[in-house]
């Protein structure tokens, strides 16, 4: 089971706001220089498309979502406690019918 908190971190106060507020996150920096973002995605009528620059592991904390990675024709369902991986320099589409809490682990 994963931890419910991060210790010994720096939180960047300014939020990252995407898609007119449908996705809001904050960046967390660790002592070793690694970063994660903690965020919320609100329900939308259409999937949200994100571009990655570094590999990302998206950990779902609460809610559920449907995700298409890169050129996949199939969406996959992810629920709280699950994660999905997106390669660097790629795209993914995500949609949810409920509030989705996530941690994005920036792995590059």
Curated annotation (Swiss-Prot):
Catalysed reaction equations from the record: a purine D-ribonucleoside + phosphate = a purine nucleobase + alpha-D-ribose 1-phosphate; adenosine + phosphate = alpha-D-ribose 1-phosphate + adenine; cytidine + phosphate = cytosine + alpha-D-ribose 1-phosphate; guanosine + phosphate = alpha-D-ribose 1-phosphate + guanine
Gene Ontology molecular functions: guanosine phosphorylase activity; purine-nucleoside phosphorylase activity; thymidine phosphorylase activity; uridine phosphorylase activity
SUPFAM superfamilies, per the entry: RmlC-like cupins
The entry's keywords: Glycosyltransferase, Transferase
Known EC number: 2.4.2.1, 2.4.2.2
Pfam families: Ppnp
GO CC annotation: cytosol
Top enzyme class: transferase
Stated role: Catalyzes the phosphorolysis of diverse nucleosides, yielding D-ribose 1-phosphate and the respective free bases. Can use uridine, adenosine, guanosine, cytidine, thymidine, inosine and xanthosine as substrates. Also catalyzes the reverse reactions.
Descriptive protein name: Pyrimidine/purine nucleoside phosphorylase
Naturally occurring in which organism (per UniProt): Acinetobacter baumannii (strain ATCC 17978 / DSM 105126 / CIP 53.77 / LMG 1025 / NCDC KC755 / 5377)
């Amino acid at each position: 089971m994963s931890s419910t908190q991060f210790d010994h971190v720096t939180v960047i106060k300014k939020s990252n706001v995407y898609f007119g507020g449908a996705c809001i996150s904050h960046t967390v920096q660790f002592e070793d220089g690694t970063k994660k973002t903690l965020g919320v995605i609100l329900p939308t009528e259409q999937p949200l498309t994100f571009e990655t620059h570094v590999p990302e592991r998206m950990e779902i904390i609460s809610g559920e979502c449907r995700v298409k990675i890169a050129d996949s024709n199939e969406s996959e369902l992810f629920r709280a406690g699950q994660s999905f991986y997106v390669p660097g320099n790629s795209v993914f589409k995500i949609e949810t019918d409920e509030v989705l809490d996530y941690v994005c682990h920036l792995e590059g």
